[in-house]
Amino acid sequence: MASSAVIKLALVVALCMAVSVAHAITCSQVSANLAPCINYVRSGGAVPPACCNGIKTINGLAKTTPDRQAACNCLKNLAGSVSGVNPGNAESLPGKCGVNVPYKISTSTNCATVK
């Protein structure tokens, strides 16, 4: 019984000493979360709730400057690769979902300046 407690204590100490590793946001995460937004950025109209949920998810994952820059680059690439995107619709999307994104969703955004 005592050895079980020692093992548990050792595991707790090891976990406390572990260095946390930052995981950058991936473009596949951004694409998957924003797939419900495609029709809106092409045609306008009502923003689907699933789209806003995706934007909120991505914004919530972007806690650090590198994460925000990675998300920005993914959004910039998506905006340029999806055919028929209306730039105004893409730019207005965060505001319509009540999300404060610290950069413009545009193919001209300089993501290196995002903090």
Swiss-Prot record:
GO terms for biological process: lipid transport. One of its GO terms (molecular function) is lipid binding. Disulfide bonds join 27-74, 37-51, 52-97, 72-111. Keywords: Allergen, Disulfide bond, Lipid-binding, Signal, Transport. Residues 1-24 form the signal peptide. SUPFAM superfamilies: Bifunctional inhibitor/lipid-transfer protein/seed storage 2S albumin (SSF47699). Belongs to the plant LTP family. Plant non-specific lipid-transfer proteins transfer phospholipids as well as galactolipids across membranes. May play a role in wax or cutin deposition in the cell walls of expanding epidermal cells and certain secretory tissues. This is Non-specific lipid-transfer protein. It comes from Pyrus communis.
